[in-house]
Amino acid sequence: MLGMAFLVWRWLMPSMESAAQLSPGWLAATLIRNLVLITIVAGGTHLWLYRFEGQGTALRYDSRPFPKNKRVFLFRDQVRDNVFLSVVSGVVVWTFAECLILHLAATGRISTYEMGEHPVWFVVAVVLIPWWSVLFFSAHHRLLHTEFLYRRVHSWHHRNTNVGPWSGLAMHPVEHVVLFSDVVLLLLVPFHPVHLYFMLLHHGLGAPLSHTGYDALTFGPLRIRVGDFHHQLHHRLVECNYGGVESPVDEMLGTFHDGTPEADARMRDRRRAGAASSSG
């Protein structure tokens, strides 16, 4: 995502002069650019893996077809549901977060700097941003699994027990707002635009890639790791792996699951203990 962040900053970012004004031109151009990006990444990956079956079921976590004619999904179809939520809500919220931060920076309300002004801090921020994103996600994701928020918001995302690229951003609009709100950090600390795009693309394109349903994409001898077995188990079992695999949250909460029978037994024990405490 860092390379893509540099690409967007260098060639696809609106000028600060434009961003200082909330004019329809650059706002629409930003929305269209983000739509193109997600269509290339999520749409292209979906076509390769599921329409053209470019690598069959090799390295696929779950070989079942995506559900159709299921009332739980919009249009009674998982893929159409996922595309609609990703595009109509996900990309709009992503674009809003980007445009808001750029406008605040362009009007001097928050601070930015050139790469040459603070090269050490630029590199430090690049190293820290993935950790910030993982910890922020782990915290808000665990909150989304509280009963009130899960039933009303997060259950939309968990309709997808068997995920594909379009499932990554298929969620309730409220969850989109929460997901992209980790950019609030940039309201507090000076940043370079690359940092903004690194954070946004971590979700906007990273979520589709981590939900491919495959461990890796293969093109002849080339193998590109994209899947996330840790999170795949979360979609299947729900009550485990709330954080990213790098996050200490699940180890701290006792909810880490590595797919082994021993982890299954621990989860069953935890469920029994929870049921006993609820009934008592």
Write out the residue ranges for each language-model feature.
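Acidic (Asp/Glu-rich) catalytic motifs at the cytosolic membrane interface
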Residues: 136-163, 210, 214, 226-239
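N-terminal start-of-chain detector that recognizes signal peptides
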Residues: 10-13, 158-159, 203-204, 220-222
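Functionally important transmembrane alpha-helices
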Residues: 189-247, 252
